[in-house]
From Swiss-Prot:
Protein name, entry field: Migration and invasion enhancer 1
Family according to the record: Belongs to the SelWTH family.
Record membrane topology: Lipid-anchor
GO biological process entries: apoptotic process; negative regulation of apoptotic process; positive regulation of cell migration; positive regulation of filopodium assembly
Subcellular location: Cytoplasm, Cytosol; Cell membrane
One Pfam family linked to the record: Rdx
Lineage, uppermost ranks: Eukaryota, Metazoa, Chordata, Craniata, Vertebrata
Gene name, Swiss-Prot/TrEMBL: Mien1
Length: 115
């Protein structure tokens, strides 16, 4: 024994599916609006929770921050006026990864705070 810790595998054991695998997310956002940082923050949180997930970004129109899970629109900033709560998105991803129906997210946090 060398006293070195054994390497930790991030690959799931045979027969187990990596969390989020089979789920494809597309986030369409307005880059000139400054929404790229919000996308990157959200994508990082999602990948941490669901390492097997596929996340794709697309540039969208003015004011857009739209999220699709497996081709289904689950959140629209254009409709809701804010951004999704992380917990609501994680729940939608969990449902999709379990093969359950995904409902549209209607709760949203304000896009900015006025002090």
């Amino acid at each position: 024994m060398s006293g070195e810790p054994a390497p930790v595998s991030v690959v799931p054991p045979p027969g187990e599916v990596e969390a989020g695998s089979g789920v494809h997310i597309v986030v369409e956002y307005c880059k000139p609006c400054g929404f790229e940082a919000t996308y990157l923050e959200l994508a990082s949180a999602v990948k941490e929770e669901y390492p097997g997930i596929e996340i794709e970004s697309r540039l969208g129109g003015t004011g857009a921050f739209e999220i699709e899970i497996n081709g289904q629109l689950v959140f629209s900033k254009l409709e809701n006026g804010g951004f999704p709560y992380e917990k609501d998105l994680m729940e939608a991803i969990r449902r999709a990864s379990n093969g359950e129906p995904v409902e549209k997210i209607t709760n949203s946090r304000p896009p900015c705070v006025i002090l």
